[in-house]
Amino acid sequence: MFPKINTIDPYISLRLFEVKPKYVGYSSIDARNQSFAIHGIKNYEKFSNAGFFYTSPTEITCYCCGMKFCNWLYEKHPLQVHGFWSRNCGFMRATLGIIGLKKMIDSYNDYYNNEVFVKHKNRVYTHKRLEDMGFSKPFMRFILANAFIPPYRKYIHKIILNERYFTFKFAAHLLSFHKVNLDNQTTYCMTCGIEPIKKDENFCNACKTLNYKHYKTLNFSVKL
């Protein structure tokens, strides 16, 4: 289901991406292994291979991008979780390669989609579901403001959300709404969320060559 890990030493290949790890002391896999071993953690190799070192019983950290992974102990696919939630991590790019990372994110999207069903167009119900899923209040306000305005209101079937996209599913068609970084006015690829693209485009060149399904799109700007 997921691509194989590149056998090239990630610390060396990070130079290709001009990335300086945030925790240089844990750049080697031996150092990351030791961080787990001294705390008596078993079967830790999958976490250290995914770039993480031990921080606490409830948290591990990526040595490169600094991503915090909570409630990690029973996760079966830490590498996939890492790539999905930290797509610009230099370690992940060096380990899987750009194309491999894109393919992994695409396959993992199906596994990690969250859904909010809109029942009776109830704002309170939807707000509570979004809050339970951990989304910020500004994001929830934006979702609700756009979900319940005419003419879309009567067509909404459900709302699907994940880390990079939120999609309103309508009875007649599908519209994907992509987040835009307002600080530097950069838009990212609708499919992978990694590569920056031009304002009048929706997909990067790599995703176009992979023949991803192209959805009819509308772009909204939101600062979370």
Curated annotation (Swiss-Prot):
Q: Which UniProt keywords apply?
A: Activation of host NF-kappa-B by virus, Host cytoplasm, Host-virus interaction, Inhibition of host caspases by virus, Late protein, Metal-binding, Modulation of host cell apoptosis by virus, Virion, Zinc, Zinc-finger
Point out which parts of the chain are C4-type zinc fingers, as ranges: 189-207
Q: Which domain of life is it from?
A: Viruses
Q: What is its main location?
A: host cell
Where are the annotated BIR repeats, by residue? 29-92
Q: One Pfam family of this protein, by short name?
A: ASFV_p27
The GO terms describing molecular function are:
zinc ion binding
Which Gene Ontology cellular component annotation is one that this UniProt entry carries?
A: virion component
Where are the bilayer-spanning segments?
A: none
SMART domains attached to this UniProt entry: BIR
Keyword rRNA-binding carried by entry: no
Intrachain disulfide bonds? none
**Which subcellular locations apply to this protein?**
Host cytoplasm; Virion
- GO BP terms: symbiont-mediated activation of host NF-kappaB cascade; symbiont-mediated suppression of host apoptosis
Q: Summarize where Zn(2+) binds, as residue positions.
A: C62, C65, H82, C89
Q: What induces it?
A: Expressed in the late phase of the viral replicative cycle.
InterPro entries linked: ASFV_p27_C, BIR_rpt
* Subunit description: Interacts with subunit p17 of host CASP3.
What family does this belong to? Belongs to the asfivirus IAP family.
User: What function does this protein fulfil?
Assistant: Prevent apoptosis of host cell by inhibiting caspase-3/CASP3 activation to promote the viral replication. Also induces the activation of host NF-kappaB.
The molecule here is called Inhibitor of apoptosis protein
